[in-house]
Swiss-Prot record:
PANTHER family named among the record's database cross-references: CYTOCHROME B
Natural source organism: Ophiophagus hannah
Binding partners and assembly: The cytochrome bc1 complex contains 3 respiratory subunits (MT-CYB, CYC1 and UQCRFS1), 2 core proteins (UQCRC1 and UQCRC2) and probably 6 low-molecular weight proteins.
Spans traversing the lipid bilayer: 25-45, 69-90, 105-125, 170-190, 218-238, 280-300, 312-332, 339-358
The keyword Membrane is annotated on this UniProt entry: yes
Miscellaneous notes: Heme 1 (or BL or b562) is low-potential and absorbs at about 562 nm, and heme 2 (or BH or b566) is high-potential and absorbs at about 566 nm.
Name this protein carries in UniProt: Cytochrome b
Protein's cellular compartments: Mitochondrion inner membrane
Binding site for a ubiquinone: 193
Binding site for heme b b562: 75, 174
Cellular component GO terms, alphabetical: mitochondrial inner membrane; respiratory chain complex III
Lineage of origin: Eukaryota, Metazoa, Chordata, Craniata, Vertebrata
Length: 372
């Protein structure tokens, strides 16, 4: 440990020489976090957390504030970039067995939950139609809690419906949570450098380590530059690509949109929620879709850490990726046939991965022992 700290102080953080591009998403997430905090701060200067003024204040930012449209679009597209990076980051963790570093994995899942809460609160702030109705639907899930549900919902809303107090507290939460994310990120990175990164074969890197700078820092810069280029391409040519058309109308509690849905990065969880025709069951499945990630370090049965040399588990992993994409797609569709059955089947497949992963690990161990 002491040697690692000396190397760290000498700007020579030792990192395995064979980590691939999939390990670059951590630095990309850090870039997203810095950008979201900065653009969010500039937006907060001009934003007004009042149900009568919120929508107008966002229009004022995009029309009248110098470069306000840039800040607003960067913040909106940046959120999508953040989630693309975090989902790839988690997928890499599952594929290469990074979750066996338990402290790092569990702090990472805590970060994901905090990030999802932050994004949800942020989505409500423009006070557009979809903002309002998505907030109504999601916060209403609290009523599914036996005995305490209604009291908790009223407490969260600050009244008997979503109103001015709700928007004010959501803005306060959206402002404070990024600083909690920054703190958790620091803990996540400190815990990571306690043991160091894993690598594609899942072996010990101690025999072959190189300084982080200049080797991996330049490699990180390439991917960060690619991400920023993509961000500015979307900003310049199609800034509303990821926005919901309903959000261009001011929130109206009297008119319900035809199809209420959250932002695209929550659709996989929303698809799982919708596929269960029971409020409490759906809410539990929604929570479990994220919480189940915490089980992976404790259900690992394979002798090898990574999936690199485990073809059976690889098939299972890519099924999970296909399931995630299919769930996202079906959640954009109305609740009718055949989308109901597709959602239900893919929801089963999603949880099936976490049940089958330890079983397949054990099976592969048996196959390896037979070959010996």
């Amino acid at each position: 440990m002491s040697n690692q700290h000396i190397l760290l102080m000498s700007n020579l953080l030792p990192v395995g020489s064979n980590i691939s591009t999939w390990w670059n998403f951590g630095s990309m997430l850090l870039t997203c976090l810095a950008m979201q905090t900065l653009t969010g701060f500039f937006l907060a200067i001009h934003y007004t957390a009042n149900i009568n003024l919120a929508f107008s204040s966002v229009i004022h930012i995009t029309r009248d504030v110098p470069y306000g449209w840039t800040m607003q679009n960067l913040h909106a597209i940046g959120a999508s970039m953040f989630f693309i990076c975090i989902y790839i980051h988690i997928a890499r963790g599952i594929y290469y067995g990074s979750y066996l570093n338990k402290e790092v994995w569990l702090s990472g899942i805590t970060l994901l939950i905090t990030l999802m809460a932050t994004a949800f609160f942020g989505y409500v702030l423009p006070w557009g139609q979809m903002s309002f109705w998505a907030a109504t639907v999601i916060t209403n899930l609290l009523t599914a809690i036996p005995y305490l549900g209604t009291t908790l919902t009223t407490w969260l809303w600050g009244g008997f419906s979503i109103n001015d107090p709700t928007l004010t507290r959501f803005f306060a939460l959206h402002f404070i949570l990024p600083f909690i994310i920054i703190s958790l990120t620091s803990i996540h990175i400190i815990l990571l450098h306690n043991e160091g990164s894993s690598n594609p074969p899942g072996t010990n890197s101690d025999i072959d380590k190189i300084p982080f700078h200049p080797y991996h820092s330049y490699k990180d810069m390439l991917m960060v530059t690619t991400m920023i280029t993509l961000l500015f391409l979307i900003l310049s040519f199609s800034p509303d690509l990821l926005n919901d058309p309903e959000n261009f109308s001011k929130a109206n509690p009297m008119i319900t949109p035809q199809h209420i849905k959250p932002e695209w990065y929550f659709l996989f969880a929303y698809g799982i929620l919708r596929s269960i025709p029971n409020k409490l069951g759906g809410t539990l499945a929604l929570l479990m879709s994220i919480a189940i990630l915490m089980t992976t370090p404790f259900t690992h049965t394979s002798y090898t850490r990574s999936m690199t040399f485990r073809p059976l588990t690889q098939i299972l992993f890519w099924t999970l990726v296909a399931t995630f994409i299919t769930l996202t797609w079906t959640a954009t569709k109305p609740v009718e046939s055949p989308f109901i059955i597709i959602s239900q089947m893919t929801s089963i497949f999603y949880f099936f991965f976490f049940i089958m992963n330890p079983i397949l690990g054990w099976t592969e161990n048996k196959i390896m022992m037979m070959n010996d």
